[in-house]
Structure formats: C-alpha cells, structure tokens
Amino acid sequence: DALVLAYSQAVLVAAAGNDGRPNEPLCRGAPMYPANHAWVLGVMARTEFPNAKGDYLAGFSNWDCKTSNGNEYELMAPGAAVWSTLPGDSYSAWSGTSMAAPVVAGIAALARTRWPDKTTYSSRFIMGQVGATGGNLKAITPLKGPAVSYPQADAYNALTSTPSPELSFEELWLFDEVAQGDGNDGDGRVDSGETVELAIVIRNRWGKADNVVATLSTP
C-alpha cells in the first residue's frame, strides 16, 4: 500500500537483484521485490560490451522470464565495473544491479524535470519515457530457445522521444457459464454452439492511447 501511494506521486526504481535467477516460478525462479511490481521500474544489469555470443546481460543479474506480462523487470542499465565514490575520498569499480538502478533513477529524475506536470504526465508516463525509448539489447538466459532482448536505459532518448502507444496482450479470461447460453457447458473452453464472453487485458507500455480497437482472429 505504501508503494502504491508513493507511485501516485513519484517514479519508483528498484534493483532486480544479483542472484542470476529469473523472476517467476514459471522459469524456476523467484521475484525480487519491489523491482517485480508493475508500478516499479525494475532494473537489470548490463555489461558495457557484449560477450562473444553478443550477450549484454551481466551474468550475476537477475533477469525477466516473460516480458510484458505485468510482473517484470523493465530494462537494463550499466551495472558491471561501475566507478563510484567510497568513504575516505576514494573510488572503486563495483558491479551489481544496485549500481544499475541509480542510473535509471537519475534518468527518471531528468524526465520528471522535463515534464513536471504530474496531472498531465503521470508516473506511468515517465516510466514509459525511461523504459521504452532506449532500444533493445540482446540477452542470453538459461532458458532454451532463442536469445531474448531487453530495453536499455538511454538518457538522451528518454528526454527527446515523442511518446507513442506501445500495446501488448497481457491476459485473457474466457467465460462459458450455462447462464450465458443454452448450449454452454461451463468447462472453460469454446465449443461449437456456445455463447462465450471474453475479458482481455491489454497493456500500454508507453504513450497515451485513445479509441483502441482490438481484433480477434483464429488460425
């Protein structure tokens, strides 16, 4: 509840963690909170240069198992061998998602300075400017199949890109209860002769979208 209240007034940023694991039980992982909340920008760590396989995801970084499903780490930021200050007037290069998250927090602060009106430009708008404008970089995870890609932080693009809708399908519920039609059997499947109702969740990751039209098709 505290985070939800804070989200209404501020952009929330959190480190994804350094266990090298995915964020969902679906992938035999476990989420890191608060980074995995939908109203928090969860930050993974990337390397400065790709390895021989073209992978930018830091090996220690937790990673997103299934993107655009509402529970996720949104983007990568530099988090490997990042120079920072230490007590005693010294410097050292440290690695971790805790080094990457401040990069994103700084970009979010710049974006809020660029768009200060919170009524017109909500926290979700700033999250979109930061998380959807940097382009994607290749990431190789332990999952079988092709490599994935994650958005990266880019301060210049976050401050200069024109917002546009970025819609994705998130979730679907199907209802075929007997009360909805004489031919319904309530088994949760679409059978011949049934009258069904669908509840579809579409997520907009970035700019404002008006008069959205969805088309349902079958193979």
Where on the chain are the PLM-derived regions?
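C-terminal subdomain of the subtilisin-like protease fold in secreted/lumenal serine endopeptidases
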Residues: 1, 39-42, 53-56, 113-186
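Extracellular S/T/G-rich loop segment that most often corresponds to the catalytic His/Ser-adjacent loop
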Residues: 9, 32-113
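Active-site neighborhood of phospho(di)ester-bond hydrolases with catalytic His/Asp-centered motifs
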Residues: 13-17, 43-44
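Distinct, well-ordered alpha-helical segments
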Residues: 22-34
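Outer-membrane beta-barrel proteins
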Residues: 186-190, 202-204
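Short, solvent-exposed loop/turn segments enriched in Ser/Thr/Gly
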Residues: 192-199
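Short acidic, flexible loop segments centered on an aromatic residue
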Residues: 201-219
